[in-house]
Amino acid sequence: MSTRTARSLGPDLVLAGTVAKRAEILVVGLTSGPDGPEIALSEGIVAEDVLAEILDSLIAVGATGKPEQLTRVPAPSALSVTSVLAVGLGSADKLDSEQIRKSAGAAARSLSGIDTVATTLSILDLGAAAEGFALGAYSFTEFKSSMTAPGPDSQPLARVELLVPSPRTKETKATLARSAAIAEAVATAREFVNTPPSHLYPAEFAARAKALGVEAGLTVQVLDEKALEKGGYGGIIGVGKGSSRQPRLVRLEYASKKRGARKVALVGKGITFDTGGISIKPAAGMENMTSDMGGAAAVISTVVLAAKLGLPVNVVAYVPMAENMPSATAQRPGDVLTQYGGITIEVVNTDAEGRLILADAMVRAGEDNPDYMIDTATLTGAQMVALGNRTPGVMGTDEFRDRVASISQSVGENGWAMPLPEELRGDLDSKVADMANVTPHRWGGMLVAAHYLKEFVPEGVQWAHIDVAGPAYNTSGPWGYTGKGGTGVPVRTMISVLEDIAVNG
């Protein structure tokens, strides 16, 4: 079985029972231990004496099995490949799916210029290995000219043969199909985030979201600026009116074939570029605000993925899109706007715009009577101050918040449950409107933003808010299966939550 994740988004993933002659390199896992490194399980696919020869070569050049350590040695003559790449897995007794995923990604990143590899990592965990290789090999080169585009010797890895004992079973094929679909969804979210705002503005973003939705069989509706104005979407209009690029609201609905299936609303912040508006940001690092639609990218990719997987759960996604710019028509600090549904807001700071567009979309999503609601956004710098750039903050109704955070940790996206202290809500009181969009102080900024959003969650709906301000965009060096730029977080969390709801309600 072979499955291509998407054009240029990842390598061809192929199930195999033996190392084919086409493969140039065999990738194996190496665990560490008190008695030295060991090659991880191979299920008889590679002969024991050959593995022993490989291990001797690896030890001779100093391989230890340290997590994601890469060591390449010539292949024994008994193998058809030219070399063996060992990737460290760490201690065998601590090995889990996420480490396999990260190690596979590290291997994939090191294999530019290689057409085909075979790997035994898939014997340990087929799904994790497939996702790791696919995401590690992802690259974004759309805007590279012929002068700087990767040449033949530096193209991303093209094909991965995933070695398993029984490559033709229905269960094995289904596992690979799911993992390939997840990798494609994550890569699609990365593509959106990495596309510059000159090419991905609200109207274009909406058009691309619609095209993906229609292709997946979703019901799609796009509201333009006139429809938003007429409908009373004051938050989206207020944020977007400073830009010549008019705002949009996209609705994508996946209807399960299962009678009585639970309904989940997904809402994602889609600020295609954020200058801060009149409350303008410092110039240093502002170019990274191309990532301020990371939540929207993840939501679009997730609802499309739910349809492709045929999940027995209903999903309705709302994606508000706007560009936050300073101009003569931009909203001002001190303005008052009316959110969809009627709550009036004093705009104290125009750089706290994400919550304004999310609130409109959340109230509208509530009209679809969901059982659960998840919103996600690159919402606050305070998230990075509190949790760093790899740990999303998860807030919301206690039980569902903890459920989402637990699932996020299990899939390697590491969401962390955070409280919503009641005393912080009072800091959003306004003298001129129902609420202010920020507090007069900077304490607990991530939690205050969640308190703001909580005001727009319908009564009785289980809700989780995932702040991915840091985790959605990697500004440091590559690691594991994550390169620089868009990461696709929290697609894997949200699809796993949908799967969990489909099974457990």
Curated annotation (Swiss-Prot):
GO terms for cellular component: cytoplasm. GO terms for molecular function: manganese ion binding; metalloaminopeptidase activity. It catalyses: Release of an N-terminal amino acid, Xaa-|-Yaa-, in which Xaa is preferably Leu, but may be other amino acids including Pro although not Arg or Lys, and Yaa may be Pro. Amino acid amides and methyl esters are also readily hydrolyzed, but rates on arylamides are exceedingly low; Release of an N-terminal amino acid, preferentially leucine, but not glutamic or aspartic acids. Mn(2+) 2 binds at K269, D274, D292, E353. The active site is at K281, R355. Its EC number is 3.4.11.1, 3.4.11.10. This is Probable cytosol aminopeptidase. It comes from Rhodococcus erythropolis (strain PR4 / NBRC 100887).
